[in-house]
């Protein structure tokens, strides 16, 4: 079956999910991102790869961090950037998604960065855009958030280059997390031998083992001999009903404290896709501690998004 993210000759056309992306393309994105890391240190933080191109950030769902890093990434590539907060624009007046897309296409946009609360929205848009337009999924419902998954993997690779001897633990609200799915698909494709998920049963999707992960419900047991600890935000806004007794109870069992982190390897790194709930899924002593690479993740996010945009622009037919 043809992958809708790829051109007929196997190049990247859209970035919608890490699921099903060939290892060669994942490595191409990570290697290209490596070349962009130094751009932020230059006096002139620009490269001309997207000069003359227009990138539209279309956010049907709010996100300060993701929107800002995509904006910075596009501007560092010298693109013209339009940011549309659709919740306050024509959508709220009854315009459909396709109307919005058609209007932006008529303005000769070249790339759409789309965030939407509905799973599958980015795939839907990619199916309906003009042939010259590239679509990047900036998060769709619970489904996928590929650039976040890739920037997490990029961060892991910088601190732990030997991906074939790694144990990674993803901890927390896996059920509602599009980041967890994107990250797990990327890690397993890149050959990481052991990915664990640690969560209460109520916060795990059905048949999660099919993703190729080992499931743990006890934090201390799950963190034993781990190299990378990825904490997930407790997503209160996506929860229906009482999946948890209380935030305090959750922190007691699944919050990452120095005491729990001691079960991982002494040189383990701690990650979080943000925004953090301090005192819910992570203790401040850990978030601000020497094993935390949470702020470098944000920095690398710009390089990874620059890489994705430049590869897509280079693959224009």
Swiss-Prot record:
Catalytic activity: carbamoyl phosphate + L-aspartate = N-carbamoyl-L-aspartate + phosphate + H(+)
Subunit record text: Heterododecamer (2C3:3R2) of six catalytic PyrB chains organized as two trimers (C3), and six regulatory PyrI chains organized as three dimers (R2).
Enzyme class: transferase
InterPro entries linked: Asp/Orn_carbamoyltranf_P-bd (IPR006132), Asp/Orn_carbamoylTrfase (IPR006130), Asp/Orn_carbamoylTrfase_sf (IPR036901), Asp_carbamoyltransf (IPR002082), Asp_carbamoyltransf_Asp/Orn-bd (IPR006131)
GO MF terms held by the record: amino acid binding; aspartate carbamoyltransferase activity
E.C. no: 2.1.3.2
Originating gene: pyrB
The name this protein goes by in its record: Aspartate carbamoyltransferase catalytic subunit
Source domain of life: Bacteria
Keyword Transferase among record annotations: yes
Keywords assigned by UniProt, alphabetized: Pyrimidine biosynthesis, Transferase
